[in-house]
Amino acid sequence: RRYQGVAPGCHLVAAKVLDRRGNGRLQDVLRALQWISFNQNLYGIRIINISVGAAAMDSKAAARLIKAVEQAWDQGFVVVTAAGNMGPAYGSVTAPGSSKKVITVGASDMLDRISSVSGAGPTAECVCKPDLVAPGADVISCANKRNSYAIKSGTSMSTPRVSGAIALLLQKDPFLTNVEVKMLLRESCLD
């Protein structure tokens, strides 16, 4: 293997919500969250990484998505979501990252500055978001062709890095709650 992620020893469980063009529907994300919830114990799922966000979503649909991720959070999952790439304007964090409960990740560039496209808060409910930023520029990631890679940028690249760090944290202390994980991450960030 040429490349490996932040937590190369962790087991991944994938729930596909996008087609080969990168398009998806709200119903597919909601169905995936239900599947994860149902299979939590079978696969030992602790972390839900959601590297998609929806800017062009009506408020009713956004509320359904936020409700679903908050239900997952309330079940004890560590839910990590992308802030979206609609920044840098205030209030540009996309759903479900606008949820006050979940860990919302913005993107930083090669110079450790917040990326110009990274979603920014506060949310419509005056919640400070994102909770943290992680490298999201020029990341080598998998591509949609067999055994191929591509260089990508954005919060969809920074979010899995945080999820990987959380996997390592939970490996060290498996009894941490999602709230404790979020608190530890926020307290360890440099401003």
Indicate residue ranges for each PLM-predicted region:
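Hydrolase catalytic cores
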Residues: 1, 13-19, 92, 136-191
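Subtilisin-like serine protease catalytic core
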Residues: 1-27, 43-46, 74, 98-101, ...
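Active-site-adjacent substrate-recognition loops and nearby beta-strands
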Residues: 29, 56-60, 81-100, 106-129, ...
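Sec/Tat-exported extracytoplasmic proteins
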Residues: 40, 52, 56, 73, ...
